[in-house]
Amino acid sequence: MAEFETVRRAGAGIRTAQIDEGLRAHMNRVYGLMSLGMLITGVIAYIVGMDFAAARAGEPTSFLSPEILQTMFSSPVRYFVIFAPLLVVFGFGAAVNRLSENAARGVFFLFSALMGLSISWIFAVYTGASIAQTFFVTAIAFLGLSLWGYTTKKDISGWGTFLIMGVIGLIVASIVNIFLASSALMFAISAIGVLVFAGLTAYDTQNIKNTYIAMASHGQTEWLGKAAIMGALSLYLYFLNIFQFLLMFMGNQE
C-alpha cells in the first residue's frame, strides 16, 4: 500500500511538471502571437500614416499614391477602414469553433493588418518621439500587469463583471462625447480607460493560465492551439487600448 501511494504521488508529480512545462510553452506562444500581431499593426500603421502625413503636406509619398490615401481617409471607404477590425473580431468570435487552427491564426493576422490601417492616422497627428515614448511606457506597464496576473496567488476572477461593465461604460461615454465634443469628458474617458484595460490585462492573463491548466488536466489538448490565439487577441486589444488612451495624455501633436 505504501509503495502504491509512493508511485501515485510520483505520477502526480510528473503530471504536474508536464503541465507546468506546457503552461510555459503555451504562455510563450500567446505572447509570441500577440507580439507578431503588434508588429504587423505597427509596420502597416507607420507606412500608411507616414504616407498620409506626406500627402497632407503636399510631399511625395513612398508606398501609396495620394489618390489611394484620399479614398481611404476622405471618402465613405474610411468607414470600412475604421470598422473593419471590429467586424473581423466579432466574426472571429462567432466562428472560432468552426475554424481550423491555421485559419484562426490567419484571421488574427488579418485583423492585425486591418487594425494597422485603422490607427495609421496617429502617425499623421502625433510626433514620432511621443508615439515611441508612449509605446515604451505601455509596454512596461503591460508586462508588469501581465506578470502580476500570471504569478499572483490571489483569485481575481471576480473582477471580470466589473471590468466588462467598465468597458460598456467607456463605449457609452465615448458615443455621447461624439456629440458633446467635451475635452473634460475625453480626459475622464482616457483616465478610466487606462485603469479598466490595465485590470483586464491582469485578469485575462490569469484566465488564460487557468484555462490552460483546466484543459491540460482533462486532456483537452486539441483546443489549446486556438486558445492561444484567442488569448493573444485579447491581450493585443488590451495593450492597444492602453496605448491609445495613454497617447491622449503623452502624445505631442505635429
Predicted regions and their residues:
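A hydrophobic alpha-helical transmembrane-helix feature that marks the membrane cores
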Residues: M1-E254
